[in-house]
Amino acid sequence: MEHFRNIGIIGRLGSTQVLDTVRRLKKFLLERHLHVILEDTIAEILPGHGLQTSSRKMLGEVCDMVIVVGGDGSLLGAARALARHNVPVLGINRGSLGFLTDIRPDELEVEVAKVLDGHYLVENRFLLQAEVRRHGEAIGQGDALNDVVLHPGKSTRMIEFELYIDGQFVCSQKADGLIVATPTGSTAYALSAGGPIMHPKLDAIVIVPMYPHMLSSRPIVVDGNSELKIVVSKDMQIYPQVSCDGQNHFTCAPGDTITVSKKAQKLRLIHPLDHNYYEVCRTKLGWGSRLGGGGD
């Protein structure tokens, strides 16, 4: 296991609870004589911190590990910037759900100490890369750890499009949109739209139509190395949008093509040794607990 000396900290802005947790984390790391580097945006609202700062884009180059304090959305944003550097990422949950941010604030010192002592698991999560092309030229590009979503934007009208997988025509469709999700994203927007839960170790992509105009239209799970192409109908009278993790947005025009494929770099996500994916699902999704008197 790697032993970490240079620790980066990213914190969600706009929350006093996050700031309090960042201060505790900073104090704990410094007491262990580690080199702490703050992302510049959180550093601006921590006057007198006396630490090295870095942009999020460069943080992965100067750190052995980055700790994200916030919710799953905070970690999604960090993942897109850090995956290219192959730097491990650990999440401390200050959000509402916490599928990706494992550690509770009240156990910060104990659990982070275990990680620093080499007691942790590393899970590789792949990202998607999306590109919007118009008349053969790229007009927008983005990465996503959860999902790439084609949606109507501010319009209430349906989108008409064609779907191709690895160059093979699959179908044309009228729907409110289309969700292309990783296993990580299968418990997010795709789940709300009726998609399946996929274990994070699966090398697969799920394609989930949003309110399709055909009862036979169902989610499709394809190989993780597939290349998807979505062609917006030339007869459309609206300009739909493509969103990556709900954070980066591109506007499409009729006739545009969206390609989605696996990104080469992966996110290295750190978990405590006792991390249990099914326990996370059971807790976060409200599944039934063990029956009384059941076996171990």
From Swiss-Prot:
GO biological process assignments: NAD metabolic process; NADP biosynthetic process
Main enzyme class: transferase
Active site: D72
GTP-binding recorded as keyword: no
Keyword annotations of the record: ATP-binding, Cytoplasm, Kinase, NAD, NADP, Nucleotide-binding, Transferase
E.C. no: 2.7.1.23
Alphabetical list of Gene3D superfamilies matching this protein: Probable inorganic polyphosphate/atp-NAD kinase, domain 1, Probable inorganic polyphosphate/atp-NAD kinase, domain 2
Cell location: Cytoplasm
InterPro entries linked to this entry: ATP-NAD_kinase_N, ATP-NAD_kinase_PpnK-typ_C, NAD/diacylglycerol_kinase_sf, NADK
Reaction catalysed by this enzyme: NAD(+) + ATP = ADP + NADP(+) + H(+)
GO molecular function: ATP binding; metal ion binding; NAD binding; NAD+ kinase activity
GO CC, any one term: cytoplasm
Required cofactor(s): a divalent metal cation
Cross-referenced SUPFAM superfamilies: NAD kinase/diacylglycerol kinase-like (SSF111331)
Binding site for NAD(+): D72, G73, N146, D147, R157, K174, D176, T187, A188, Y189, A190, L191, S192, Q247
Function noted in UniProt: Involved in the regulation of the intracellular balance of NAD and NADP, and is a key enzyme in the biosynthesis of NADP. Catalyzes specifically the phosphorylation on 2'-hydroxyl of the adenosine moiety of NAD to yield NADP.
Record family assignment: Belongs to the NAD kinase family.
UniProt name for this protein: NAD kinase
